[in-house]
């Protein structure tokens, strides 16, 4: 559709005006040229992303959000533009075609038009109270979120998982007790909450009986190995 092609022109103008100058400022280009892996990595913290790299990404997202692009896929009620799947596919293709840069980096899913998987999950399946409490802080970065799906014995096949959720009462409060382990939980080092996928019913190999649980990283029993 022509409306999508026009929006690509709007994005290109924004990149030229706001993002490219930031990319070239203070040798930030080191995060995208042949030095990028070393520049992005804090080797003294077991290979976590460097603070300088994450600070730059935060500023990119702030500028994109201020300009109205970062939340494109979300409904207008959350500052988005009701972006369709078709539009998102075309935008990602266009930005990737421009090459590696601060505007778009498929290596770590950062882009001026956010691939907002976690907010979309909360919007589509969360309760109104959850949306009111977490959606905006999640989008601004005030709260860090990630998700736990992959397990060492089963990969990302979510129909086979050993993580279990059972109803329980703790200190008089009804909830869930989750037991299991996850791996490759990108972003956990700064996350306040994790979306943990666990089986609460059904049998291994079944697509039903799997739930997604919001788990605070300071919850009792939560450990990072």
Predicted regions and their residues:
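N-terminal glycine-rich flavin-associated loop
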Residues: 106-129, 155
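Short, solvent-exposed loop/turn elements at beta->coil junctions and helix N-caps
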Residues: 77, 150-154, 183-184
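Amphipathic, small/basic residue-rich leader segments at the start of a protein or domain
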Residues: 1-112, 129-133, 137
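A short core secondary-structure module
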Residues: 174-175, 179-224
């Amino acid at each position: 559709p022509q409306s999508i092609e026009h929006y690509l022109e709007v994005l290109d103008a924004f990149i030229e005006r706001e993002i490219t100058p930031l990319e070239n400022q203070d040798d930030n280009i080191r995060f995208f040229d042949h030095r990028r892996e070393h520049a992005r990595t804090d080797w003294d913290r077991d290979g976590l992303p460097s603070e300088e790299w994450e600070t730059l990404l935060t500023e990119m997202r702030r500028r994109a959000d201020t300009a109205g692009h970062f939340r494109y896929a979300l409904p207008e009620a959350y500052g988005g533009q009701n972006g369709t799947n078709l539009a998102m596919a075309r935008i990602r293709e266009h930005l990737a075609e421009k090459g590696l840069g601060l505007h778009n980096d498929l290596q770590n899913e950062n882009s001026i038009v956010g691939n907002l998987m976690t907010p979309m999950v909360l919007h589509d399946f969360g309760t109104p109270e959850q949306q009111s409490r977490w959606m905006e802080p999640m989008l601004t970065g005030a709260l860090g979120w990630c998700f736990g799906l992959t397990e060492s014995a089963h990969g990302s096949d979510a129909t086979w998982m050993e993580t279990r959720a059972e109803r329980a009462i703790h200190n008089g409060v009804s909830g869930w007790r989750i037991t299991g382990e996850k791996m490759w939980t990108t972003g956990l080092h700064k996350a306040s909450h994790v979306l943990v996928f666990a089986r609460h019913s059904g049998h291994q190999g079944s697509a039903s009986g799997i739930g997604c649980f919001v788990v605070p990283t300071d919850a009792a029993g939560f450990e990072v190995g």
